Every structure is written in structure tokens, then in C-alpha cells.
Amino acid sequence: MASQHSRRSREAPRPEMSIGRYTRLDEIGRGSFATVYQGVHTKSKTYVAIKSVNLSKLNKKLKENLSSEIDILKGLHHPHIVALIDCHESTSHIHLVMEYCALGDLSLFIKRRDTLGSHKYTRDMIAKYPNPPGGSLNEVVTRHFLKQLSSALKFLRDRNLIHRDIKPQNLLLCPSPSSYRSGHAQVMPYKGSDDSYEPTTGLESLPMLKIADFGFARSLPATSLAETLCGSPLYMAPEILRYEKYDAKADLWSVGTVLYEMVVGRPPFRATNHVELLRKIEKGEDRIRFPEDNPASDDIKKLIRGLLKRNPVERLNFPEFFSNNVINDPIPGLLADDAPGPPQSPRPRQLVGKAEESPYDTGPEDKLAYPPGQRPVTTHPKSGTPPTATDMRRMGSADRPAPAISKEQQPGGTPPQRPGPVSLATAPGRQELIDRNATTAAMDRQRHRNTYAGAPKASDSTIRAQEARDRAAQEVAFERDYVVVEKRAVEVNAFADELAHSPRLQGGLSRPGQTGAGSRRTTTQGLPTVSPSSPHANAAKAMQVVSGRARADSTHQRQHSYERRYGQSPTSATSAISKALNMASGRLFGMGFSPPLAITKGGRSPPLAYNPFPAYPPVHASLLITGDGSKPNATGDEDCKAVQEIEECATRSDVVFGFAEVKYKQLIPLAPSASTDPSARPMDTNVEPDSADSDDGLTVDAIVTLSEEALVLYVKALSLLAKSMDIAGAWWSRKNREEVYGESPTKDSMSAVAGTRINYVVQWVRSRFNEVIEKAEFVRLKLIEGQRRLPPDHPSHPDNHSISSTAGSSSTADVVVSPGVTAERLMYDRALEMSRAAAINELTGEDLANCEITYVTAIRMLEAVLEDDGMRSMPGSNIERQSSSQGGEKVVLDELQVEDRQVVVKLVSSMRGRLASVRKKVAVLAKRSSAPTPTAGSAGKTPTSNISPVTYATGVTPPR
């Protein structure tokens, strides 16, 4: 391990850098967003680890994780948890000064088990407890590490914390405490507290284990559940892989995998992705196998099998784990000098220990003088400085810090009190008060850390009164968000009317047929125009669209506390209403972002007969090349980009809408006559649908399932439509600004075509937006009615919904969507099915034209999965190229792990390759069919079966 550090320093020598009271030395580790350096305290000459996080590589979610990690570490002081010593911020980096662990992590320790005998810090350990053959560690060492890991976990559970990323890479090792006392260890680490290197359990002659990396940690009481997919796949609990809600037992599964790896030398389950890993876990059926020659004791094997239970209910719980004889009994097989002596009374754990004279602290100014949670954060106030970990949020009335108090005033073990209400229009809903995620919990602690220090413990009645005030404040904030949702529908229609009646667009920029397009909008409500030969013609005609706008008085309902949370999306460049739409829609419909990799439940996937809807009525004029083939000018190029971005986003929304229509039409089967079709009549949103007339033999469970799936898909389509309108609004604002300041260039054919096309698309988006809102409201009422008809013991029955979440609600009913039902998950599964069907047809050479359409639709659906609801777009699209040039920020969606995103991106890339291959085959067939000398009656004709029947607008084809 020392050789690794020296090799890295030789490969990448860096000049020393001063960071506060510390000097940054050589690099010792590197991750995706941070680099870890060895550092030294300038006065005491003791060593620290400095984790330098590059702020330019962090998006909003990662900054929240960093803030959560800092906030949690400030309040954790335990010998087996890596302590945060200090925190400094510059304009480009946040430097976390942490305890230095000279032996690296446990994964490296296991990997280099055969060379530990030659290492100065571990040679004595190997001499006393040699590792057995086969890749495992000596059981004495394994039990020693397990005892220390369990001590840290008990400390976390006492504080209702769950780590969620327990793995060997996050378990760091320090030289044995005895080596420090004897002076054998030459590298003396800086102490985060007086007992940082005094183990609470285990052997003092063996290396000391510490848990690190609390980026995914969060507060989770014993009775609460979480549902965010996070952690490392190989060590991730199966309930997380199944996208089910989970509790703190997920950490115990990770402990079981780590223990298995120490005993065997490899993880119990290995796979290349989440789906394959879950398949192997399920296939194993809780039969954990060990090599025949493995020397592990029966007690260890029994403990591992108890921890690696697929069903969390059958898994050991924390009291059983902490009381296990492997944890509590003395370690068998110890040598005489390691045998335990007479028991000593445990040292009381104080929030702040009194610093003692030691080689770690050489002067009084270097001793810890700050209570936990009040460590100094050195900031450099400069213009343009990115937000720090302590101000990555809006400041409310409760955010004003109180003066810091001395450690004598800090009551030991005083629990934090609930913060006061924050009067913000965008304040989070009730869910953040009941089932907080890691970010919200961290921000709440950051808000009131200094306000409760030194205050007497509040009585239960005071806490209940405070909770009631909090709920009232959050209700008011939510109502404000709800009003904004309806305002968004008004703004969409107002902007479309503005473009439709703009003298600048109508006076010289309109083209023949523009008026006809407007009239078609009022009659067909934006149904896509297809040619008679298109395979989608019947599908397009089959669905009559409801006329009318969304009702301003329609009653939207709040969601319950255990529903999925829809994270905030970045604020649009032209309108903050889009963000409010997405946030309030999430609370209203229970929509949350879930990583798309999942095992499809029975009955969730739509039938393979689904045909993708084509793009909005195609425009045959090309913007990418002018009439003479020359490159367009700068202004024209900007117009081209705007058109392409709007069309791409609208096309993705159209694909999602088509998928939702499949669910909708299963709920409301089409009658032979459109006049009798319930979906063709204007819907009265004040009257719930008559299930007896429209169910058409569907079971109640099927109605609820279809309604939930249609609802989340319609909400996803709404968010994409809103994004298209925001892009168009940005283009229109720029045009108006140029006109005001006299910067508008001379009108040319390019600008005329761009204005016409954008106006054309905006009118289509407007009518589709109104249509989706209308249908989403109908599906919502259908869902409420279906849930009422469920058996009383069904989890989705209204009587089984959370009561606390509806306290103070004046609404008639709440909309609750089952956990795991998300648009992204449905879209991912559907795209996989479509691509597989297309691949089979491609291999057999059947219906290649339809293969092309299917591939394009599957690609668009996956692009919508990866689509952020802010002003960022897909890899390879103009929006992302623009954002990357501005800040280089990597798009990582809320709750979508980097690994999952990479899997989806690779799948899209593979589909594009297959699409290119199909198009080549279609072109070859078309060329062959036109090779014979044409007759007089068939000159110039080519078989339509070999040509794509849909003409896509420029910018709609997948990015190459």
C-alpha cells in the first residue's frame, strides 16, 4: 500500500498546496468527482487526508449528497468512523480534511493479502495470524474487523442513520493502536477527537477499521422506509434492486456481503448490471455456498446466511445482529499476548471529548475547540463562488444561526428539535416532514444546528404543537404550488396565442396552409397527420380526441407520505413555471424518478401490438441546408438549433403520449361509432366515470394498474411538452430582444421558415398539452374510483392510506400511486420489448420498414427516460452540447445512478447502430427493386413496402 502511494506520487507529482492549517501533499486516490491527497498539519506535523471535490463536476444532486455527507460527518464522532476535521472552500473546490488511514481500504487489504507479510504495519499480524490458502483472511482478523464494523453500525442506528453504501472500498484501515503507542508507526495521524484511535472493541494489535464515505447516508428511523436506489451494485440489498421500499436492514445485507468477501475472498454474487445481479440472487434461493476447503467456522457461516436473506423480513434484524455470539463472544484462537485482560468500564461517549496532551496535538491552538456540528468552515467570499455545503439551499426565517455556544453548554445527547416553518412558496410538501430523504434531513440539520444547541429539551406537547405548525405551513406552501400548475396551462395557451397572432410571424413569415393548420387544431386537437399508406393511419384514426381545455377548478389532490418523491428540476431559462409544474405534478400524481433498470411485473408491459405514434404533422421544408446548399448564417443557425431542439423534445413527448394512449384505450375501449365513444365526448371533471359503463370486463386490479400507468405516463408527457414550450419561449424572447435593441438582422428565407415551423410546432404542443391535461384528469378520477372498489385489505384501498398525510386536507380524495410505478420504468421496459421485436424481424428480414419505425420509437422512448425536466437534453443533442460548453456539468438525474445511466446510454447507442444497419438494408432493397427497366406505367415508382412510410421532420431523427 505504501508502494502504491509512492507510485502515484511519481506518476503525477504535484506541488504542495496550503489549505488552511494544512499542507496538501501527494495524491493517494482518485474518484469520479474528487481526488484524495495526503496532507500534513503545518504545526503538529501529523497527517490528514484531504478530499478535494471539483465543484464544476457536480450537478445539483451530487452537491446535495456532498452537503449531506458534510452535515452528517460533523455530528459523528466515533473511533470506527472516519472523522471530518475541517472543511475549506475555494472558488473551484471544496476541501474536506479528514482522518488519515494509512493502510487504505479493505478491498485492497483483501486483494493484497499475500503481500501483507512484507508490509511494516501488517507483518506482525501475519506472523501471528497467517491467512489460510484460498483467498480469505484469517478468522481472527475477520472477527476483529466485524466487531469494529458492528460497533460503528450500532452507533449509527442509535442515531437513526443508515449508511446505504457499506462495501470494502468504504471501510478504511489504520495501523494498529499498539503500533502508535510503541512508536513503531512512523506516520502519526491527526486526531479528530481524543479517542479517534482507541478502538471500542477488537484487538489493539490488529489494524483498526473505520467507515467512510457518507455521501449516501441519511436519517431513517426504525419505523420508516426509503426507496432511493443508491449504493454499489455488488453489495446492494435485493429489495433495493427490486425498487421496493427498504429500511435499515439494507445495511445488514451489505454487511453480509462484506463478511462473505472477507471469509471467501470474493463477493457472494457477481454480475455486470443490476438486473443480472438480482437474477442471480433470486436464483440462489438463499442457498449461500462456501468452498469445500474454506476454514470458516460454523458460527461465521450461519451469521452470513442469516444476513444474506433475500426477504428483509427473514433477515436478521439489528438487535439480533448486535447480540450474535460472533459479535459479543471473545475471538477464539487468540495468542496469549492478545488474550483479553480484566474488563474495563467503557468510557462515556460525550459529544465533545476533552483534548489531551499527545503527539497529535502540539499546541493549545490546535486542539479541538468546536462542538460537533460547529467546526469551522473556512470560506473565501468571492464573486461567482459556487455554493458551499452550508448554503446549498434557500435561506428562510429559521435559517439565521444563533451564536455558537461552548462545549460546557452543550447538553449531551440532546436530540435536535424540529425547525420552525419556512414561509416559502416552493417549500417542500408534507412528505419531507414525514419521510425525509438524505438531502432534506441534512438541510434541516444544517438549518437548525445552532438554534437548538444549549436549549432545554422540549416537552412532547411543545413538539406536537411545533409539528402542527409545520404541517400548516407546508399545506399553505403546497397550495401555492398547486395554483401554479393551473397557471402553467394558462401560460401555454397564452404563449401559443401570442405566436399565432403575432404580426411579425403572420406578416411575411407565414406560409401557405398556416391558417389551415390553425383550423385543423380546433377540430382534431393535434392528432398526427399520417399518409394513408402509413401503418399508423388506423391507430391515428382510432382515437378521437376530447376538445376543451383543462378546468381551472379541477380538484388536484395531494399525495401520501410514503409516495415517491419527484425531485426538483433545474429552473428553466425562460419560465420557473415548468419547475413548479413538475414538482406539484409529482406530489399530485405520486410520480417519482426511478432508475429504469427493473424486473417487469406481470401485466405491467403493454401488448406488442402497440404501434408508435408518428411525429407531429411533418414539415417538408428543410432548415439545415439552404436552397443553394450553402451553410446558413449565424442567426439562421441559431434558429435551426431552436427548431431542432423543440422538435426533438416534442417528438419524445409524442412517443410517451402514444404509450399512454395504449393504457388509456384499454381503460376506455373504442366503440364502433365515435359518437358513442366515451373518450370522444367532453368530459365533466366534476363527475367521476361510471365504471359499470366503461370497464368492459376489466377487473378492479386491472383498472387500478392501467390508471396508474396511464397517469404517470401522461405526467411525463406533460413535462416534455412544457420543456418544448420553454425552449420556444426562449427563442421568442431572444427574437423580441433583438428587435427592441435593433439587433434583428434582415429577414431572409431562413428566418421565415424557422418562425413558421416554430409557430407550427407551438400550436401542436398547445393542443397536445390541453389534451393530455384533460385525459390525465379523467384517468385520475378513474384511479380514485378503482381504488375505492378494491377489497378493504388491499394496500391501495383508500382506508389503508396514511392518515397523517391527509391531516388538515380539505380535498375529497387523495391520489396515491403504488410504489414502483413510474413512467421511466415503464418506458424502459417497453423500449426493450420493442427493440427485441425489431431485432427478430431484422434477422428474419421481415417488414424492415416497420423495424426502422420501431427502432426510432424505442430510441426516442429511452431518450425520454434520460431526459431531464430542466433545460438539459440527451447526449449528443444540441442542448447538452450547449450546456457542456458552458459549464461542463455532467447530467445525472435525480435518483438515477451513474451506472444505470451508462447502461441506458449504451443501449441507445446499440439501437442506433441497428437502426443504421436497417436503413442500409432498406436502401439496398429499394435500389434493387428500381434496377429493372421501368415500364411506362410504373416509371419512377418504388415499392412502398421498402420505404419508411413516415416522413419525419428535420431534427427528429435520432442524433448520430
Swiss-Prot record:
ATP binds at I28, G29, R30, G31, S32, F33, A34, T35, V36, K51. Belongs to the protein kinase superfamily. Ser/Thr protein kinase family. APG1/unc-51/ULK1 subfamily. The keyword Ion transport does not apply. Residues 376-388, 520-536, 930-951 have a biased composition (Polar residues). Residues 333-467, 503-538, 550-571, 673-694, 789-815, 926-960 are annotated as: Disordered. One of its GO terms (cellular component) is cytosol. Homodimer. Forms a ternary complex with ATG13 and ATG17. Residues 550-566, 789-800 have a biased composition (Basic and acidic residues). Its EC number is 2.7.11.1. It catalyses: L-seryl-[protein] + ATP = O-phospho-L-seryl-[protein] + ADP + H(+); L-threonyl-[protein] + ATP = O-phospho-L-threonyl-[protein] + ADP + H(+). It is a peripheral membrane protein. GO terms for molecular function: ATP binding; protein serine kinase activity; protein serine/threonine kinase activity. The active site is at D165 (proton acceptor). GO terms for biological process: autophagosome assembly; autophagy of mitochondrion; piecemeal microautophagy of the nucleus; protein transport; regulation of autophagy; response to starvation; reticulophagy. It is an enzyme of class 2 (transferase). Keywords: ATP-binding, Autophagy, Cytoplasm, Kinase, Membrane, Nucleotide-binding, Protein transport, Serine/threonine-protein kinase, Transferase, Transport. Residues 22-327 form the Protein kinase domain. Gene3D superfamilies: Phosphorylase Kinase, domain 1 (3.30.200.20), Transferase(Phosphotransferase) domain 1 (1.10.510.10). Residues 801-815 have a biased composition (Low complexity). InterPro entries: Atg1-like (IPR045269), ATG1-like_MIT2 (IPR048941), Atg1-like_tMIT (IPR022708), Kinase-like_dom_sf (IPR011009), Prot_kinase_dom (IPR000719), Protein_kinase_ATP_BS (IPR017441), Ser/Thr_kinase_AS (IPR008271). The gene is atg1. It comes from Penicillium rubens (strain ATCC 28089 / DSM 1075 / NRRL 1951 / Wisconsin 54-1255) (Penicillium chrysogenum). This is Serine/threonine-protein kinase atg1. It is found in: Cytoplasm; Preautophagosomal structure membrane. CDD domains: STKc_ATG1_ULK_like (cd14009).
